[in-house]
């Protein structure tokens, strides 16, 4: 999986990051190639069940809420063996689900975490040469790089401590020749960039408040420059991903965050969840503290914002689901609610969108497929037959969903 041209473009900064340089058929990191849950594919399945349209399913040991990633002919997923105190990464053959390699890393797992968390909630990332995983070993944030083809460990490092009574969930975000990790915690927080090939630290910045959050940062191109946008630590902030320099900051709108923001129609759109819940949009072109000047709207309402699920967008509309299962469509520039409907019960997974359809997966494994439009139209509800917490991955006409016990590949064989 060389693709030298794509990699050289990414390293030169022609496009935002390593994930953005991945081929359109790949889903190489959290929420896909742009980190926003959007796929350009047009031939995804709309109907399945445990007995229908399942290309394969592979048993996954242990417990984990991380999402699968797909690159070329490989699928990767992480899990944790709580009793054995091991963090596990598996590499599967994408056409069959056959196990290609597995690596188990001993880790002192945190004894008490939130009931909706797991010891393997961070989604891995890959560039086709290395696979990066993130987990806690005692109080150490631990990053390991494995060889894509063989699974051999290439490097291991501890960027810092992580103190969070609810556990850990910081997914690795590739950018050019770096990987970037959020270290918001109940102590001195940090945002750190490591050289992807070696694990050597490139830059580090302190976060403003000692408050845990669980968000993956998102890389976006704004007004001709790359920005890394991160919610957490009682704020939303934009950074220069090459240097870590703070570009702008908005105070609040709440204390703790799990969902990741998205960028559309020249605005940063985000949901937030504890203790306040709502939907917020920010103009990311300002400098310094822009709380009073660049917040386009802030709608504080529990049914409008997801604490855990991130938003997704198609065309000029944004789609959100609350943790309690209320799906909605909104205007991202004004916050005006277009429609709101119940989509099952509790949701942890972030929705994905492709070919004019939004795929909402609830915790029971039901997938609510809705037209990505300003008029609500439920296309179909499909049952997987297994609880799920991770977000779907999309690749080459197939949908990959991680259940409580299996990884499912949905679509034609």
Feature-to-residue mapping (PLM):
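Bacterial N-terminal signal peptides that target proteins for export
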Residues: 1-12, 17, 21
């Amino acid at each position: 999986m060389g693709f030298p041209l794509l990699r050289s473009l990414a390293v030169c900064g022609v496009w935002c990051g390593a994930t953005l340089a991945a081929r359109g058929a790949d889903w190489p990191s959290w929420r896909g190639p742009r980190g926003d849950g959007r796929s350009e594919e047009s031939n995804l399945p709309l109907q399945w069940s445990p007995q229908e349209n399942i290309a394969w399913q592979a048993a996954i040991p242990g417990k984990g809420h991380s999402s699968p990633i797909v690159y070329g002919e490989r699928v990767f997923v992480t899990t944790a063996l709580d009793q054995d105190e091991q963090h596990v990464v598996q590499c599967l053959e994408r056409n069959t689900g056959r196990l290609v390699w597995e690596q188990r890393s001993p880790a002192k797992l945190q004894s008490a975490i939130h009931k909706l968390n797991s010891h393997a909630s961070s989604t891995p990332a890959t560039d086709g040469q290395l696979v990066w995983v993130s987990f806690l070993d005692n109080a150490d944030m631990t990053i390991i790089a494995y060889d894509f083809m063989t699974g051999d460990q290439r490097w291991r490092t501890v960027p810092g401590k992580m103190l969070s009574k609810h556990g850990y969930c910081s997914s690795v975000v590739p950018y050019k020749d770096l990987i970037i990790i959020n270290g918001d915690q109940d102590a001195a927080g940090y945002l750190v960039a490591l050289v992807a090939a070696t694990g050597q630290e490139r830059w580090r910045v302190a976060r403003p408040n000692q408050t845990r959050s669980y968000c993956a940062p998102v890389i976006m191109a704004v007004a001709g420059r790359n920005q890394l946008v991160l919610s957490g630590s009682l704020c939303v902030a934009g950074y220069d991903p090459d240097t870590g320099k703070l570009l702008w900051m908005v105070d609040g709108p709440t204390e703790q965050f799990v969902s990741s923001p998205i960028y559309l129609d020249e605005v940063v759109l985000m949901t937030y969840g504890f203790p306040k819940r709502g939907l917020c949009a920010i103009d990311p072109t300002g400098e310094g503290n822009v709380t009073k000047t660049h917040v386009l709207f802030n709608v504080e309402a529990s049914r409008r914002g997801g604490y855990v699920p991130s938003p997704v967008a198609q065309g000029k509309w944004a789609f959100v689901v609350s943790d309690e299962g209320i799906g909605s469509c909104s205007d991202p520039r004004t916050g005006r609610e277009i429609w709101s409907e119940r989509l099952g019960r509790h949701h942890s997974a972030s929705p994905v969108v492709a070919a004019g359809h939004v795929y909402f997966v609830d915790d029971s494994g039901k997938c609510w497929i809705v037209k990505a439009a300003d008029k609500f139209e439920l296309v179909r509800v499909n049952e997987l037959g297994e609880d799920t917490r991770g977000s779907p991955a999309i690749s080459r006409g197939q949908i990959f969903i991680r259940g409580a016990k299996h990884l499912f590949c949905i679509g034609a064989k």
